[in-house]
Amino acid sequence: MKSIAIIGASGYTGAQITSLINADCNFSVQGLYVSENSLDKGRKLADLYPTYSHMAYTLSPLSDDAKKKIVAEADAVVLATEHSVSLELAAWFYQQGLAVFDLSGAYRFADVAQYPKWYGFEHTHPDVLAQAVYGLAEWNSEQIKQTRMIAVPGCYPTASLTALKPLKPFLTEMYPVINAVSGVTGAGRKAQLHTSFCEVSLTPYGVLGHRHQPEIATHLGQEVIFTPHLGNFKRGILATITVQLKPGTTEADVAKAYSVYDNAPIVTVKHNQFPKVDDVVNTPNCHLGWKYDANSGYLVVASAIDNLMKGAASQGLQCIKIHFGV
């Protein structure tokens, strides 16, 4: 049984992956940690999330002694921390010999030049970055097995890339257009005016400047137009994507392209049927639905996931299981 430490466990994704690991007979939770200045240190996870009342874990401060204890006892560490925090912690734990599964964006770009623009910091660990694998589980499983540094994808990129990557050989030079709506949990647990009950409303944000746009483009290998929206629901993502396919592409070609997921139990693909968020909430699943107009060459594909599950925690667990071969 592999032992997993979870850092940043007081947030939505940290608590979610704690629940998933706790329920998996292949793994044990070494401990839950928050920063030393966190107001949540010393509290029980169930005090923050009564839905997890069956788990008796306490949130410990990540002191130097705690880090040494993790290295001595754990096989892997999950980082559900801010990007700049993960930057340093991931490198330190990797250098101590642990497998690192980072839910932040600190290791998703291979190009160090991307980080100042999109994350506001210089990447100070290019040696560790060079070992990082992008943890899109259905596409990079062999690489995930071979490295100890896994950058778990963002929620919007997971929904978008799962829909688009099978179509890559058929895409024209026209940019795919991605319109995606996420539940409020995508903004995190900290109180903010725009996510409060009386203020939240369906609205676009990060227009032509969201950091997930270059993440999608980098791992698709093609530029995209990406517009995220805040939805007035708790969790889930629906991405509706319009693409132009090369002349001569047939419906049969598209169906064959999506057959790449025939042996991927988490991904369900339907032709001329479209998914809804409610069908994937609280599951690790991705539901895809597509329709193609061969006359115009345009295809619309919709992708639905739970932003806290396939968009973060359950994909993190997928990567852990792939890496350890369980």
From Swiss-Prot:
It holds the Pfam family Semialdhyde_dh. The keyword Lyase does not apply. It comes from the Bacteria. Keywords: Amino-acid biosynthesis, Arginine biosynthesis, Cytoplasm, NADP, Oxidoreductase. One of its GO terms (molecular function) is NAD binding. Its main location: cytoplasm. GO terms for biological process: L-arginine biosynthetic process. The active site is at C155. Catalyzes the NADPH-dependent reduction of N-acetyl-5-glutamyl phosphate to yield N-acetyl-L-glutamate 5-semialdehyde. This is N-acetyl-gamma-glutamyl-phosphate reductase.
